[in-house]
Regions:
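Short, well-structured N-terminal submotif of metal-dependent ribonuclease cores
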Residues: 1-40
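Short, active-site-adjacent cap segments at secondary-structure transitions
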Residues: 13-14, 46-47, 118-120
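Short, flexible loop segments at the rims of nucleotide/cofactor-binding pockets, characterized by
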Residues: 15-16, 86-92
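Short, hydrophobic alpha-helical packing/hinge segments within bilobed ligand-binding/sensory domains
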Residues: 27, 99-100
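PIN-domain endoribonuclease scaffold, especially VapC-family toxins
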Residues: 30-86
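Short secondary-structure boundary segments
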Residues: 42-43, 114-116
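Acidic, PIN/NYN-like endoribonuclease modules and their adjacent C-terminal/linker elements
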Residues: 89, 93, 97, 104-110, ...
Length: 142
């Protein structure tokens, strides 16, 4: 079985790295079993670094914990610099466009998100060459 390529948005990364959200378990299991690979680019990684420095609900991460989260991300994800060439729909939130670009540019199977605008985009457009799904919906695709 070949592995599927995945893109995670920043909030899903936070669920994995900071919040230990059990909802991300299907994605973690697919990666651990070698059924999925996660890709990230410099733009998405920069956003993750920035957000790790914000107060996150009841967590404020000190520099050591931020560094550990980033190292875990870099251990799990493959850093890829991409050039996307296909025409993509425009997100309502311009900050989310980078995730569509990364998914398209890396020929990902799925963009995994809980962002309502991205999920609505997937429902209201002609099919994209990748799925935009929640972590729970991802488990149904496997």
């Amino acid at each position: 079985m070949s592995s599927m390529r995945l893109v995670l948005d920043t909030n899903v990364w936070l669920d994995w790295l900071v919040f230990d959200d059990p909802g991300i378990a299907p994605v973690q299991a697919a990666v651990a079993a070698g059924h999925a690979d996660i890709v990230i680019d410099a733009v998405c990684e920069d956003e993750l670094i920035r957000v790790l420095g914000y107060p996150l609900q009841k967590w404020t991460l000190d520099a050591m914990r931020q560094s550990a989260c980033l190292e875990q991300c870099r251990h799990v994800a493959c850093r890829i610099d991409i050039q996307y060439t296909m025409a993509l729909p425009q997100c309502d939130d311009p900050d989310d466009q980078k995730f569509l670009e990364l998914a398209a540019g890396t020929q990902a199977a799925c963009l995994i998100t809980k962002d309502r605008a991205l999920l609505a985009l997937a429902r209201h457009l002609p099919p994209l060459p990748f799925h935009i799904v929640t972590p729970a919906e991802f488990s149904a695709l496997q």
